[in-house]
Amino acid sequence: MKLATATMFVVIASAAMTTGAFASPEKGLEIAIEADSRDKGFGDSTAQITMILMDKYGQSTERAIRNRTFEGDNEGDKSLVIFDSPGDVRGTAFLSHTKKADSDDQWLYLPALKRVKRIASSNKAGPFMGSEFSYEDIASQEVEKYTYNYLRDEELNGLDCFVVEYDPVDRKSGYKRQIVWMDKAEYRVHK
């Protein structure tokens, strides 16, 4: 009888550990708020980016991109992405206005059609310009758009990290959840 009771305790304890019984929403939110506060104050930024797309045969295509982001105080950030090459995407532009609580506003300018296409909130999970990124990935990440669970501490590539689960509040999100490894020193996402 004692052996059966001890076995049952081990089974229940193991199940509790694997289901996130020790997850902490409070600590997860604290970590997310601290990461967000460390990202504030940049004002604006510019970047030259090279996007490399690989097909299933291993062939690659490079796209030259300019990015400009303006930090918003209470409304969220605004960013403009312009494709400079290759020729088939030259002049294509993507404008995003991130909102803290509501759905983001996003538009795509297609020079071949001379049209601006609004990206519907129900289409945020769609692929961004033929890449594995979604329109949702391109937008700024706002604390208010997720609930959080601190899962554990774990080392990743020699860095001491928090492991935090992000659960999107928006039911139209392309993600059910995201598990993020964030270093403890700088609060940067590494995985």
Pin down the residues of each PLM region.
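Short acidic/glycine-enriched loop/turn segments that link adjacent beta-strands
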Residues: 75, 157-159
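N-terminal mature ectodomain segment of secretory-pathway/periplasmic proteins
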Residues: 24-112, 149
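Gly/Pro-enriched, hydrophobic low-complexity segments
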Residues: 33, 95-97, 105-109, 115-119, ...
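N-terminal secretory signal peptides that target proteins for export/translocation
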Residues: 1-2
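Hydrophobic alpha-helical segments, especially N-terminal targeting/anchoring helices
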Residues: 54, 110, 154, 182-183
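Bacterial N-terminal signal peptides
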Residues: 6-16
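Surface-exposed beta-loop interaction hotspot
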Residues: 140-147, 153
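Sec/Tat signal peptide C-region and signal peptidase I cleavage site
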Residues: 18-24
